[in-house]
A protein has these predicted regions:
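A solvent-exposed beta-alpha-beta segment
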Residues: 2-70
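Glycine-rich hexapeptide-repeat left-handed beta-helix
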Residues: 5, 68-71, 76, 136, ...
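Short alpha-helical
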Residues: 15-16, 75-78, 109
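Short amphipathic alpha-helical segments
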Residues: 21-24, 79-83, 128
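Glycine/small-residue-rich loop that forms an oxyanion/phosphate-binding "nest" at active or ligand-binding sites
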Residues: 69-97
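Structural signal for interior beta-strand "rungs" in well-ordered beta-sheet cores
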Residues: 96-144
Length: 144
């Protein structure tokens, strides 16, 4: 049996997406494409090809893809979570991103789809819920 390489796509091509891409690149990993209808006319964003809007995902087997949500978080704005839930309901899986420059205790619990960005410090007993963003430089002390 031949093993198919899983492709990794990031949803969104804006500012938050670029920060997450940088964190991922520092870990030595590769993102294969960007999914964002607003950037379809661009060939690439920070050197990563734009493959189209959500419909571009339909050309791949769900089992052959993993996603990163690169849509940023704004107070009172639910767009990021709506996108994730819509794609999860279709069967897609989201990866967790932890920047190599973050300090994360071995006793931290991190759920699926979480993003811990550069300069963060997560101490003993911290729990980060699904799809949360721990933004650049955040410090969460014990038992948060």
């Amino acid at each position: 049996m031949t093993r198919v390489k899983t492709k990794l796509f990031i949803i969104g091509g804006g500012g938050h997406s670029r920060v997450v891409i940088e964190s991922f690149r520092k870990s030595g990993s590769q993102i294969d494409g960007i999914v964002d209808p607003a950037y379809i006319k661009c060939e690439n964003v920070v050197g990563i090809p734009v493959i189209g809007g959500d419909e571009a995902l339909d050309t791949f087997s769900i089992d052959a893809i993993r996603l990163i949500n690169g849509v940023g978080v704004l107070p009172g704005h639910l767009g990021r979570w709506k996108i994730t839930e819509r794609l999860r309901n279709r069967g897609f899986k989201f990866v967790t991103v932890i920047d190599p420059d973050a300090v994360v205790s071995s006793r931290v619990k991190v759920s699926e789809g979480v993003q811990v960005l550069a300069g963060c410090i997560l101490q003993d007993g911290v729990t980060i819920g699904r799809d949360s963003v721990v933004n650049t430089g955040t410090i969460l002390d014990h038992d948060c």
